[in-house]
């Protein structure tokens, strides 16, 4: 899904690295809005967004301004994601409509999809992927990332009974991982 000249990561550097401070729906942390626009509450959606990239998804505005002009001709490559000419303003404005042409998939003009995990909306309103995005992620998981799939039978009986605790939980500093065999 990434264009050849996009600078996508080298396969040997492949993976997802996510700051521990962005996990959890009851997270007390905030994220600074780029450009000094304030702070956003963290609701655990950043990991979903980043893993979406790992499974082949682009931002819903098609990365205009980064990989091309910021305009309504940019696309994320998914037919059922409405066009947007830029990222959202880190808010939940469901009336925002930056591209007013009729969408072929919907047969009408539809607003920007700020509820989508692949936008930069406030994490409080992110709650969905489109069916097309789900299909692409499944294709990536069954294709280039098929090595992540492992049959259950490959797990030994001893590994099946392992459990662990993270203490204290939640933690904003140091924590311990306790394995129980």
Protein language model regions, located:
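Surface-exposed, proline-anchored Ser/Thr-rich loop/turn motifs
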Residues: 157-181
